[in-house]
Each structure stands twice: as C-alpha cells, then as structure tokens.
Amino acid sequence: MKTLLLSLVVVTIVCLDLGYTLTCLICPEKYCNKVHTCLNGEKICFKKYDQRKLLGKRYIRGCADTCPVRKPREIVECCSTDKCNH
C-alpha cells in the first residue's frame, strides 16, 4: 500500500506544471488571437498603439519584464494575466 501511495505522489509531482509561464497576444492588428509564451522573467503583457489620424492605429503587443515607456502620441496598456493585452 505504501508503494502504491508513493508511486501516486511521484506521478502527481511529475505531471504537475510547477512553474507558471505568462502568455500574451503578439499580433499587430486591432483584433488579435496569436498567443506567445513569455520568457522566464517576463511578467507583463503590453499593448502599444499610436494615434496617427491618416494611417490609422498601429498596434504592438508582447511580453516584457516591465511596462514599456510611453512615447509622444502613444498609448501603452500593461497587464499581468494570460492574454490580457487584447
């Protein structure tokens, strides 16, 4: 019985994902569904876009270790849950 219990504990530990990796969206379109697994240490999803009236909005999405710095005429949104940068 102890052997069975020990085997179940070992299988459970091996099958569990003990680490957590953030996933963020990464496409340049307004509506996005391409998912990217962030690197270790990247704990932020971001979405940047600028307000160019003639050319429309240009989107940049991805993972980062900190929220990117905003440039003039640019909007930056940051979040920290999976696929939150929609």
Curated annotation (Swiss-Prot):
CDD domains registered for this protein in UniProt: TFP_snake_toxin
Keywords (A to Z) from UniProt: Acetylcholine receptor inhibiting toxin, Disulfide bond, Ion channel impairing toxin, Neurotoxin, Postsynaptic neurotoxin, Secreted, Signal, Toxin
Coiled-coil segments: none
Superkingdom per UniProt: Eukaryota
Biological function: Binds with low affinity to muscular (alpha-1-beta-1-delta-epsilon/CHRNA1-CHRNB1-CHRND-CHRNE) and very low affinity to neuronal (alpha-7/CHRNA7) nicotinic acetylcholine receptor (nAChR).
Family: Belongs to the three-finger toxin family. Ancestral subfamily. Orphan group II sub-subfamily.
The name this protein goes by in its record: Probable weak neurotoxin NNAM1
Organism field: Naja atra (Chinese cobra)
